């Protein structure tokens, strides 16, 4: 299929990037594929270097301190209530009290006395708004601003893909909400163009993942702690590593492999603040929790080398052929089609295996594959990608991130809050029922920005030659600017990649 340069450029930005911005279609029209490839070689691409953002250990400390303050608040409230009930049940001296409260003018001053007594009660400590949510919003703002500021957004799309592949949920509790943004910055962004094995190790040893999938509480049955405390194994993390992060569902592993692998990674935990204030919230290998002895996983024996036992299993999983095929299929479905060409999946699988999981080369293989460019534009953009594409097209950088978060919530894709460890779906069928909610979001965005932009101009910015005559005519005939913008954002050409 031969396309004119601007059509190819618009396709590149919608399929592989985060959507066009002002002038971006023309800027890459000479060589759209080359522009995307050059982004892979840009130093520091994909990283967020905002010095105001907290590290995961700092965020964990802030969340812990907040929980302690809330606990102190509850205890103080309970004590106040206990005192109130004690005072209420004290023997009444109504006559004396009435005489004491009688004013010279004969009026009863009981209410004034009660008010004075209430004012004398200890005041509740000023805990303030939720610290974990404040941290979450700052991280969300940094993520969205990075996406809006990206020239093309291909590497940011890769970050989003891997972040969803290795997802956690801010709804887990235990401080995970405060860690969600730092988790992505510390495990995904530094390795997005590195080696899959390095990303895998960073992810599985991060406190957010260990807390999300309960490995911080997993204890080897025959470990020192297991024998003393009679607590047991938690297989959640081991199962999701095999099923979702590496080999894929129903492939080469068995339930015995899950159990043995869970034993291997016992001791991979998070330092409690109450035990070690200086290192609380950090990853730690605790040998007291670790199941002793060798374990066999996917037919290979691993001697008990403590922490290195788990690292060795992860290293082998990272380069397993089933992992290569699983990752290749997901990447092709995310960027190209719900049912991608098998030749594309095979091409990506080969790249993964030939380069020992080099993710930059995997991304390069995707961009240079003919099938990735010739596939029809049938794939519905997931909510997050559509929201950012709409903001980029209109040139809006929201000063308040909360409406953007609310838009994600409305569309069923709350940021860093997937419904299950498998993450959000990339299949169009799973988002098609939410088009009425998209219309609500489109109308609201259009209402906010209509006075700032020309809808006809936005058509050229956002779609260029991809815009059909019917879409242009509908926008031209719209009754108002907001309606015209909403029609553009809901157009099939804009919705699909």
Where are these regions (language model features)?
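Short, compositionally biased low-complexity segments
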Residues: 7-15, 131-134, 157, 230-236, ...
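A general structural motif at alpha-helix termini
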Residues: 29, 40, 203, 366-367, ...
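Active-site substrate-binding loop specific to GH73 endo-beta-N-acetylglucosaminidase modules
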Residues: 101-109, 115-126, 139, 143, ...
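A generic structural signal for nonpolar/aromatic side chains embedded in well-ordered alpha-helices
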Residues: 16, 28, 39-40, 188, ...
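N-terminal accessory alpha/beta regions
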Residues: 22-189, 216, 223
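Flexible, low-complexity segments enriched for small/polar residues
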Residues: 2-6, 10-24, 50, 57-58, ...
